[in-house]
Amino acid sequence: MNNTDKLDSHTPMMQQYLRLKAQHPEILLFYRMGDFYELFYSDAKRASQLLDISLTKRGASAGEPIPMAGVPYHSIENYLAKLVQLGESAAICEQIGDPATSKGPVERKVVRIVTPGTVSDEALLQERQDNLLAAIWQDARGFGYATLDISSGRFRVAEPADLETMAAELQRTNPAELLYPENFEQMSLIEHRHGLRRRPLWEFELETAKQQLNLQFGTRDLIGFGVEQAHQALRAAGCLLQYVKDTQRTSLPHIRGLTMERQQDGIVMDAATRRNLELTQNLSGGTENTLAAILDCTVTAMGSRMLKRWLHMPIRDTKVLTDRQQAIGGLQDITAELQTPLRQVGDLERILARLALRTARPRDLARMRHAFQQLPEIHRLLQPVNVPHIQNLLSQVGQFDELQDLLERAIVETPPVLVRDGGVIASGYNAELDEWRALADGATDYLDRLEIREREKLGLDTLKVGFNGVHGYYIQVSRGQSHLVPIHYVRRQTLKNAERYIIPELKEYEDKVLTSKGKALAIEKGLYEEIFDLLLPHLPELQTSANALAELDVLANLAERAETLNYNCPVLSDKPGIKITGGRHPVVEQVLSEPFISNPLTLSPQRRMLIITGPNMGGKSTYMRQTALIVLLAHMGSYVPADQATIGPVDRIFTRVGAADDLASGRSTFMVEMTETANILHNATEQSLVLMDEIGRGTSTYDGLSLAWACAENLASRIKAMTLFATHYFELTTLPEKMEGVVNVHLDALEHGETIAFMHSVQDGAASKSYGLAVAALAGVPRDVIKRARQKLKELESLSNNAAASKIDGSQLTLLNEEVSPAVEALEALDPDSLSPRQALEWIYRLKNMV
């Protein structure tokens, strides 16, 4: 219920609630009442379903019972985490007035808005995964796209050229929340995503966006960021920044700049390629047996997130890549020693974001202190490493002795979770705080003495002094001894087996204790905020340090992986082509129980396309994918699973590997296959690496073979891309005779009787047969079916020159050299000018009989 027209008919408290709710109509409003956050009306119904909490009713307002649901204040974060995972947002409304001095309802206001893309609390985040907020814009000039990781301050923009590139960006970044304009036309691109937020058009206004961004960065213009003319991207960035300011309700000092991502800087991979190569997610949607699962042994969460960004954004800048390679080489001897202090650094990046948002908790500051304490050891280990990039990173890491000293003096060794729990600031840091604490502690000592004195004086062995939040301090005596208490004991509370009393002396000390504790807590909160003020001026250097530490973690991890998994340093060449000796699939070799068979590969301007034939299960797909993964690893600066590798310039990686029906979009397997193929033929260049696996198998044999042939021809002669073309159509093995730069290779297998051994080794030349029946037998197809299939195969092979045999779907017999019809031959031999009308009529009957 969001109707505020008849506020007067509601109670004062519900009037206050409805006014606040009207400001946040589309999200759940958690309204603080004492020890609970309550939700009312439609919010209560929705929350009870989403969070599995009880739906009750609270009295009545405007003559109607009020649906209500609530959660305890101390467990709110658990419920928010669940909402965020469901793509929902929530407004948190706190009591900011004093109940003792308030006339009518206590003053309340919304102090924060939690949304999937703007959370920074560690309880709400997956620690080894980026959590991005994104905004998308589209007009006649193309797309604009902006992403922000509020938990690090990383702000990126791009202008994807077309729908395909935009889809790839969405898949790569996978935002937790996506803002889009109300007139967005390509809803099919985003409608299946969680966390969609429709925004009014004026939030994407260009001049407003520029003003917002300049104000945030403290600049006069955006020329220094290289985005001044990127109008579509700036519209998206402006909307995104405004949304963050609206939800965070605080300044954002950790967002200090904007980076333009340009397609030409990296290796472009479309959405299908990212999916097929299983970089961070497997085809089932899980994370097992992915490249990241094998490669990621980083010791910090921020390092893990950086590694995954590198995986998804292979770069082309050979200077950066060579720096990384040299750093990996330089770290190989000290990896284990370096990872020990790095592990202790923890997730400094996200702690700094919470510091910037002033939401850092006491334990965040303790972790920051612990991170600073590791820096001297990191410097000691890295100073002897004579690699320029390592020394550059080390200078960025820096040392923060003064801040370390501040936190060592100010924060206790093991602080509580929240400032409001007290006991965060260390003794000796502030004299006034120590005085009030001494008063509180002294009063506590007095109460202990009072208990002993009263027990001995009255001879009541069950007497004890206690405290609870409702009744304050009390003297408790068992029901059996309650008749023995003196007259000045005033009864405060009756329990089943005991009575509780108050005496004037106890009341006096209660006031003293509560006053001193309250005063100490107030001072402590003030000092805690002051510590933020002392740390925040150093935020830029701290962020630089955290980024350098994350990169050191990634490089040390890649050094360890190279050593453990026997990877070698690839050579990055400016000459076109790819030459790999002893290449292996990084994931498959770790999953296999038997040794992995390594294979060579050579692609060059004279050897542009490999036509790959061989049995199913022979390893064609593995061979193709491992080539793409080796190229990708080389372009993130990593060592690669090969004895040697020389990689020339690569601008894009395309894969047309396997397919499944896209039922959600109503597209068949063949339609998916052809869409991906069209994308390759439109966008591949001479420097692209293209993997084509079983093209044309989703339709009839004639159609499929014709398409496969035409695609192979186009890639080899017009585009001249570096192509691995796996096929079951043996007709394609004649392509090398017809075209330059095309070569046959095959995966070897040995057949013995009815059994088959896959050798998994790549040999020159075409495969002699497909071994399909042997594979079927391995798969458990019944023996009588296999036997019948062998009979049929012999029949078909004996009819291999008969055109009818070529119509059997999936056969690998000659299909292109069709027999010429006798009727056609007779027609070609005829001279129509020499025929009389009678002869012509006879020929028509004769031809009819031939057909």
From Swiss-Prot:
Highest taxon above the source species: Bacteria
Keyword Magnesium: no
Listed GO MF terms: ATP binding; ATP-dependent DNA damage sensor activity; damaged DNA binding; mismatched DNA binding
One GO-annotated biological process of the protein: mismatch repair
Gene Ontology cellular-component annotations: cytosol
Cross-referenced SUPFAM superfamilies: DNA repair protein MutS, domain I (SSF55271), DNA repair protein MutS, domain II (SSF53150), DNA repair protein MutS, domain III (SSF48334), P-loop containing nucleoside triphosphate hydrolases (SSF52540)
PROSITE patterns associated with the record: DNA_MISMATCH_REPAIR_2 (PS00486)
InterPro entries listed in its UniProt record: DNA_mismatch_repair_MutS, DNA_mismatch_repair_MutS-lik_N, DNA_mismatch_repair_MutS/MSH, DNA_mismatch_repair_MutS_C, DNA_mismatch_repair_MutS_clamp, DNA_mismatch_repair_MutS_core, DNA_mismatch_repair_MutS_N, DNA_mismatch_repair_MutS_sf
Disulfide links within the chain: none
Binding site for ATP: G614, P615, N616, M617, G618, G619, K620, S621
Matching SMART domains: MUTSac (SM00534), MUTSd (SM00533)
A Pfam entry, by short name: MutS_III
Keywords: ATP-binding, DNA damage, DNA repair, DNA-binding, Nucleotide-binding
Known function: This protein is involved in the repair of mismatches in DNA. It is possible that it carries out the mismatch recognition step. This protein has a weak ATPase activity.
Family: Belongs to the DNA mismatch repair MutS family.
Name assigned to this protein: DNA mismatch repair protein MutS
Species of origin: Yersinia enterocolitica serotype O:8 / biotype 1B (strain NCTC 13174 / 8081)
Phylogenetic placement of the source organism: Bacteria, Pseudomonadati, Pseudomonadota, Gammaproteobacteria, Enterobacterales
